[in-house]
């Protein structure tokens, strides 16, 4: 009887070990942001302070779902994110996802440019496995720090079989948004990210992850060069004289995104500046400052979307300026620069 109990105990231990070994592996790429900040007692303001390992230690329950590998890529505010850092992040994510044992990737990031990084990764990383970005609206010194919950939810999303082939997602406040449409809508509220007309694609509940829909518009654009072409965003507003756009072209910008009005409209000085850029073979993409809706070549007055399109500009479709800039950069570094080819890519 003693022998039987001993054998049973050993068998149970072996079974538990085997179960632990079969837990999915998730790589956690930490880049910084409010989620990695604490209050500095001298400055009396949040500053970068904690690593990915420190954040992981606040979520002991995460081990029930996955084995987490931490890769501390940086610890910077997301305001410091730029194309070189995006290239580094894409390479790290792709390397992790190419490993058969890795189920997916979590990226912690500041919320200010989180939507840009999400879209960049969605365009430049090729895998059926999920990438889930998280951030926090409260720093780690706050009593209501939202970072640990977002990290736990991200792990649950990554290991859920339903999450395959959904591209890059953003998980905060129990909601799941897709990279293409998500945007930050509030400076301080924890429910800051949403996807406008299209809504979030799923939610995280205590018992399971539920998806309501899946992203439909996705494309892959390889990174061909380490250095991205310079693309500037120029804002249209009442009384704009177009000089900022002309100056950007004269300084060597390789592409321009105009944050236009309405469906893609602008005044005559800005329209003339667009034509100036096009005369210098600098592609111009017209987006809008309006949160929802598409840009269309609809209006025929001088500076209306129809006349600007007829002059050679590209309509950004439903991409807002920051994301239109990212797509234009990647297309240009792949040698795609004609109006027809650019328009086809923006329409995908």
PLM regions: where:
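N-terminal signal peptide c-region/cleavage motif recognized by signal peptidases
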Residues: 15-16
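ATP/NTP phosphate-donor binding region
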Residues: 21-94, 292, 315
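Accessory alpha-helical/coil subdomains and C-terminal extensions
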Residues: 23-24, 29, 51, 57-62, ...
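A glycine- and small-aliphatic-rich helix-loop capping segment at beta-alpha/alpha-beta transitions
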Residues: 42-51, 113, 119-132, 147-153, ...
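Short Gly/Thr/Asp-enriched flexible loops that form oxyanion-binding sites at enzyme active sites
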Residues: 107-129, 266-275
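Short, acidic/small-residue loops that bind anionic groups at enzyme active sites
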Residues: 118-149, 156-159, 279-288
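Internal gly/pro-rich beta-alpha loop/helix module
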Residues: 134-205
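ATP/nucleoside-binding phosphotransfer catalytic cores, i.e., glycine-rich phosphate-binding loops
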Residues: 268-348
């Amino acid at each position: 009887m003693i022998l039987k109990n001993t054998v049973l105990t050993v068998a149970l231990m072996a079974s538990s070990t085997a179960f632990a070994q079969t837990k999915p592996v998730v790589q956690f790429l930490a880049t910084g942001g409010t989620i990695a900040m604490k209050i500095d007692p001298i400055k009396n303001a949040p500053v970068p302070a904690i690593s990915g390992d420190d954040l992981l230690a606040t979520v002991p329950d995460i081990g029930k779902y996955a084995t987490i590998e931490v890769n501390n890529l940086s610890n910077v505010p997301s305001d410091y994110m730029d194309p070189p850092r995006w290239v580094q992040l894409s390479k790290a994510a792709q390397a992790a996802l190419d490993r058969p044992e890795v189920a997916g990737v979590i990226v912690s990031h500041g919320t200010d440019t989180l939507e840009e990084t999400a879209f960049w990764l969605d365009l430049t990383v090729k895998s059926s496995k999920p990438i889930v970005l998280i951030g926090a609206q409260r720093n780690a010194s706050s009593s209501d720090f939202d970072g640990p919950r977002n990290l736990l939810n991200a792990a649950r999303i990554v290991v859920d079989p339903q999450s395959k082939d959904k591209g890059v997602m953003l998980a905060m406040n129990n909601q799941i948004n897709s990279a293409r449409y998500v945007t930050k809508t509030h400076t301080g509220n924890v429910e800051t990210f949403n996807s406008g007309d299209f809504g979030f694609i799923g939610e995280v509940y205590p018992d399971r992850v539920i998806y309501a829909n899946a992203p439909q518009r996705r494309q892959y654009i390889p990174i061909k060069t380490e250095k991205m072409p310079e693309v500037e965003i120029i804002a249209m507003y009442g009384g704009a004289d177009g000089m900022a756009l002309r100056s950007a072209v004269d300084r060597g910008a390789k592409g321009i995104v105009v944050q236009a009005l309405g469906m893609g409209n602008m005044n005559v000085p800005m329209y003339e500046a667009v034509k100036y850029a096009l005369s210098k073979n600098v592609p111009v993409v017209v987006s809008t400052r309006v949160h929802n809706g598409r840009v269309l070549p609809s209006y025929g007055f001088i500076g209306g979307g129809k006349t600007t399109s007829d002059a050679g500009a590209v309509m950004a479709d439903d991409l807002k300026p920051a994301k239109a800039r990212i797509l234009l950069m990647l297309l240009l570094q792949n040698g795609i620069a004609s109006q027809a080819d650019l328009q086809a890519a923006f329409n995908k």
